[in-house]
């Protein structure tokens, strides 16, 4: 999918609150003699695209042909945006273009100074007319709302109505507790806090998540309903609730993660990618961005690199695994098998298994175990080779080799939450079923098996 997307260049229009993010890097190594405050010595300044402009930067970095429409003031920040973005900006005299100055010391943000005018723009009709003139050439529209006055109810409703009439998807990063102005959009991407405010729910735990995300879809006539859940991933409601689990990376700065998410979703929808796959990719993009400092864009090359982990490190002993699992409160999914010659059926089976929890552990029969179960001619591939093949898949989190004929001892030791087996176990005893909270049976892809592959090879000789 990444190779396909890397070759696309969809035309995407973005409207919203374009801002300037300024970073003042300082040395704060002493206390002022005048008051108990830090003395900040300025080392350098770094001016970046912020708000809707950061969504623009992300889309451009991904390879999209992006066009910006907005309203800025007749000031330095407005001029900076016009010089650095391809698009058209209406100038409202006397209006302050949003400018956020972050004071940074030792890679930590210690203070933020904002200059902005959050009153509703005076050029609504002109902006709508400009949009009507441009829209027909684009594959998707992004509304990036930071509540700075550009995306008024009138502007939002006009944009969504026009785009919908042309069958062009509209993706909205919303702000505030009233989402009614976004009614009819293709999707919204509120975070957990924003969704709670709009729904007036106390929490989104358990059944409340599905109830809430479905309510957003129905109340605001959305094609898809999405809630970003930070470290828990992205929740999607289409015909039913699905969770795209987050990708774990060290978090340095969450600034701009939401911008990267909506940029990837817009790029994917404009390129014809299925919505759940788009959510999975958006998670990977967010994981890359939060590992950086400040508002930063993401590219497909970075996402590819993110997925190229040292897969041998995913092969663990059961003792190592138990230590790692104790450190995280995650839903553990376990499955097992010989996986002698990995084929398409295995891939789809493991991919489905991963979606049922946060961490997927594959218990792998050792060479000695396979030989006892399958005969002297097996395995075809060694346990290390088989473990590396499984660990190379992004949806497999850990591989653990066991020497027994069944995984009972391993399951008893690790105590996973969910045990996965093939649908052929429907009327059979599942080893370890009494230890776990839940057993899930997954259908195999028809026509694929290691034995059939071996027979086919023998027949050709």
UniProtKB/Swiss-Prot annotation:
Binding locations of ATP: 191-194
List of catalytic residues: 259
Pfam families in alphabetical order: CTP_transf_like, PfkB
UniProt entry tagged with the keyword Iron-sulfur: no
Region (Cytidylyltransferase): 334-461
Catalytic activity: D-glycero-beta-D-manno-heptose 7-phosphate + ATP = D-glycero-beta-D-manno-heptose 1,7-bisphosphate + ADP + H(+); D-glycero-beta-D-manno-heptose 1-phosphate + ATP + H(+) = ADP-D-glycero-beta-D-manno-heptose + diphosphate
Enzyme class: transferase
Gene3D superfamilies in the cross-refs: 3.40.1190.20, HUPs (3.40.50.620)
Leader sequence residues: none
CDD domains given in the database record: RfaE_like
One of the record's GO cellular component terms: cytosol
Matches recorded under InterPro entries: Bifunc_HldE, Cyt_trans-like, PfkB_dom, RfaE_dom_I, RfaE_dom_II, Ribokinase-like, Rossmann-like_a/b/a_fold
Positions of region (Ribokinase): 1-312
Molecular function terms, GO-annotated: ATP binding; heptose 7-phosphate kinase activity; heptose-1-phosphate adenylyltransferase activity; phosphotransferase activity, alcohol group as acceptor
Enzyme Commission designation: 2.7.1.167, 2.7.7.70
Protein keywords: ATP-binding, Carbohydrate metabolism, Kinase, Multifunctional enzyme, Nucleotide-binding, Nucleotidyltransferase, Transferase
GO biological process, one term: ADP-L-glycero-beta-D-manno-heptose biosynthetic process
UniProt similarity note: In the N-terminal section; belongs to the carbohydrate kinase PfkB family. In the C-terminal section; belongs to the cytidylyltransferase family.
Function (record text): Catalyzes the ADP transfer from ATP to D-glycero-beta-D-manno-heptose 1-phosphate, yielding ADP-D-glycero-beta-D-manno-heptose.
Assembly information from the UniProt record: Homodimer.
Protein name per Swiss-Prot or TrEMBL: Bifunctional protein HldE
Taxonomic source organism: Campylobacter jejuni subsp. jejuni serotype O:6 (strain 81116 / NCTC 11828)
Gene expressing this chain: hldE
